[in-house]
Amino acid sequence: MKEIVYGPVKSWRFGKSLGINLLGEIPRICTFSCIYCELGKEGIYENERRIFVPTDKIIHEFKKHLRENFEVITFSGAGEPTLARNIKEVSDRIREIKKDIPQVLLTNSTLLNMDEVIEDILSFNIIDCKLDAVRKTTFERINKPMKGITLENVINGIKKLRRSFKGILSLQIMVLPINIGEVKEISEIVKEINPDEVHLNTPTRPPWKKPVEKEKLIPLKELFYPLKVRTPYD
């Protein structure tokens, strides 16, 4: 992914979305190397926050899309967006230009234990946090975290965000054949967090070629009752 601003693209979770890539042209900059990542295997591990793309450049590219029709502005892109130290500055600048469009942050939750990260993202309208496992072995197998990133930190970080975030908090669980048997355990942690919405997803884009079938995914929604749950098959 080389575009700084891309789309709009249709999202089953959020509608027509204009994407913001804060991380630039490197194939992937992330604290994870998930086995289902659509960006592929290339990329670098990183957990130090810095500015990858100057704010003015991002805003310049954003303004080129102002005549397009989109329902949300989604901060995602080529890796983990909270690694970008200018995430709040970019968000604030975009809000000055497009006050009426909700801003969505997609995060893998690994940096939410940092106070400065929490402070930087509180103004988003929607934050969608990843939680694919609650067992250490499954976490390491699916998400392939860089050294020093632990499952405990991820879960505690999401709980920390929940306590201070006033917007809509959703949790995304990527359901795969290797973690489908763990979804009940995941649901118990999710209920403790008490998000506004749960997204039971399954990968449908390359390099992953075997999404969980509708007949297996839909019944899992019951495990999260009474929380609101959505799937790509709804």
PLM region spans:
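Canonical Radical SAM [4Fe-4S] cluster-binding loop centered on the CxxxCxxC motif
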Residues: W12-V53
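Conserved alpha-helical substructure of the radical SAM core
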Residues: G40-T74, E89
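Flexible, glycine- and charge-enriched loops at secondary-structure boundaries
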Residues: E48-T55, K147-L151, K210-L217
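Glycine-rich beta-strand-to-loop/alpha-helix junction loops that act as flexible
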Residues: T74-E80, N108-S109
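Conserved AdoMet/S-adenosylmethionine-binding subsite of the radical SAM
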Residues: L83-V212
